[in-house]
Amino acid sequence: MWGGNQSEGTRFRLFPQPGFLDSYAEPEVVMVSSPAGSVMEGPSDDRMYTIFPIGKPEPYGIAPNGEDVLAPPWRGDIEAPAQPDENGHFDYLEPGTPQFETAHLFGTVRFVLDIWEGYFGRRIPFHSEKTYDRVELTIQPTLENAYSGYGFLEMGGDRSTGSYKPFSLNFDVIAHEVGHSVIYSEVGVPDPENVTGEYFGFHESAADLVALISSLHFNSLVDLLLENTRGNLYMLNAVNRIAELSDNKQIRIAANDRRMSEFADGWVKEHHLSQPLTGAFFDILVDIFHEMLLDYGAISPEMEDLSDKLLATADYAPMMQEMFDEAYADHPEKFKLALLDARDILGTYLADTWERLNRQDLNFVDVGDVFLDVDQDHTGGRFASIIRGNFRLRDIGFVEVGPQLAPLGKDSHANSVRTLLPMD
């Protein structure tokens, strides 16, 4: 990864998916690029610091009186910070303590930044760097949400099932918020007075894609994913259960069938508006995966053609699953290599695309056009037909999104604490 020799990095233990899921009950040891000994208590480094405040009355943002703005740094009491071991690592910490939570939050943010700095080929600055030397990573149990804002990333938790599930232990939620930070830095913070609905949808889609691709950097998740699906990624599975909160509740499913025509009369929630774009990119990921399987000789051209013809028909599951079962049994190593290749191709293409986008009047057609340009630059257009076909299936470029039909709700992230900026 960009930024350091992994053999000399710092170890953390992270849950690839929420730890209350049976398949992911134990955290996995990962190595981040920060050299061992460079991450101090907190954890903290030269770019960010992690705290678990005691007695912090409200999350950052607009105060309940509607006048004051609560902003970092928090200057009150905090839980005892996590300490590195004698070799500079944090993987000795056990779940169930504030110190493990703060280490998990810091380790996840650093892990995701490593991944995306690898795709960008450079350091990704935080958009708050002109004001704050470091970003505050904060755990706020009274918050039933998670936000990446100006100078902070704040994690609450979920109480919808009756028991508290902290987002500081949820890799997908944290990675999603890091995704927002990446887009704020690379594309820009939306201007509420001059922004398109599709920009809001693009932002949510990009954050989901950051979480999706980042999760595929866990060997345990990739192995379990392939073992469960036998390589048939159109099955509903771990990789497209973004921000999963329980075994049967999924948010923003990437493998969706939503189209832009559903929003021709207008839109209300940017999360819904994001789904055609996220779905198009998930389908592109799967199609590139199939191309890589062909390159490795793991499937035949006839099998790929049949998969394309039967997709979205009642015959797909019974016929194609048997063929995938046989092919995966013969070539499990090639299936894994093909998936990792597809992951890195999509990650690199997205990074190159986001670098070139302009937030002004941004729409999904712009995203697709730039993505095609990136493919042309990298391969001479090898995947152009795949890209065009999947955008066409989502009506992107063929249907214009209607107006915003209602004010953004309390659950909206588009016009929220995330987009508050200091006055110049």
Where are these regions (language model features)?
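Zinc-dependent metallohydrolase catalytic domains
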Residues: Q99-T102, V109, L113-F152, G157-I174, ...
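Acidic/polar low-complexity interaction segments
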Residues: M1-R110, D114-E117, F126-K130, Y184
